[in-house]
């Protein structure tokens, strides 16, 4: 199944968090925080502005982004955990 978000929504896959600290201590699953960083896997076609014109999104598929701790709605598609959020929930794009 493929998910195509509508309007100004994006689908994000969280990046995997480190299993160990820099000092080599293994972090148990219940002590890990969910990463606030992810990769855009799909984008909507933009919101409709006040002038009834479509406003394109600033992010694109493949962008690595930062978002708020409580941003988005968690969904499971084909066994993969994803987030659906509005573009305004994204704080920034990480440049490579």
Curated annotation (Swiss-Prot):
CDD domains: cpn10. InterPro entries: Chaperonin_GroES, Chaperonin_GroES_sf, Chaprnonin_Cpn10_CS, GroES-like_sf. It is found in: Cytoplasm. One of its GO terms (cellular component) is cytoplasm. Belongs to the GroES chaperonin family. Keywords: Chaperone, Cytoplasm. Its main location: cytoplasm. Pfam families: Cpn10. The gene is groES. The keyword Cytoplasm applies. GO terms for molecular function: ATP binding; metal ion binding; protein folding chaperone; protein-folding chaperone binding; unfolded protein binding. Heptamer of 7 subunits arranged in a ring. Interacts with the chaperonin GroEL. PROSITE patterns: CHAPERONINS_CPN10. Together with the chaperonin GroEL, plays an essential role in assisting protein folding. The GroEL-GroES system forms a nano-cage that allows encapsulation of the non-native substrate proteins and provides a physical environment optimized to promote and accelerate protein folding. GroES binds to the apical surface of the GroEL ring, thereby capping the opening of the GroEL channel. It comes from Hyphomonas neptunium (strain ATCC 15444). This is Co-chaperonin GroES. GO terms for biological process: chaperone cofactor-dependent protein refolding.
